[in-house]
């Protein structure tokens, strides 16, 4: 992309973003950028942002790689512990890099019941709190009297 036909104002960008359109904008220092992160999902949720969708795809691939090495292992507590430990390490690495604010992997007798063990199924639940991106910045400037103390 070498240019944009219409230079968008801040208000233009905000108007487009309010109706779920990520505007393409030109900034002197940054160049041409997609200025937004919304998806076309109509229902408000964490998945209506591109960064969360991409994170979820990445997490599913990573945990699936861990799961694939667990296939055909004994469906016992030691295997569960190994899977959970490896998933915790993977998710912890993502958290350290600010992709997640928190997570929990549940893999125990509440998720993998004796009935599931008898059917050769290991069942884990991965709860995640994705990090959210800043979309708007609000800054207040407050003018105070000359004698005012900022400690009060």
Regions inferred by a protein language model and the residue ranges of each:
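Structured, hydrophobic secondary-structure cores that serve as assembly/anchoring elements
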Residues: 1-152
């Amino acid at each position: 992309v070498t240019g944009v036909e219409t230079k968008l104002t801040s208000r233009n960008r905000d108007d487009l973003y309010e109706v779920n359109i990520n505007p393409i904008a030109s900034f002197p220092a940054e160049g041409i950028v997609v200025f937004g992160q919304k998806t076309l999902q109509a229902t408000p949720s964490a998945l209506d942002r591109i960064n969360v969708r991409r994170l979820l795809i990445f997490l599913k691939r990573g945990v699936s790689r861990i799961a694939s090495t667990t296939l055909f292992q004994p469906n016992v507590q030691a295997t569960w512990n190994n899977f959970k430990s490896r998933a915790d390490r993977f998710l912890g690495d993502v958290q350290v890099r600010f992709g997640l604010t928190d997570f929990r992997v549940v893999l125990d007798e509440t998720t993998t019941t004796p009935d599931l063990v008898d059917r050769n199924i290991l069942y884990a639940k991965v709860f995640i709190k994705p990090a959210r991106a800043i979309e708007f910045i609000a800054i207040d400037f407050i003018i105070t009297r000359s004698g005012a103390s900022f400690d009060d």
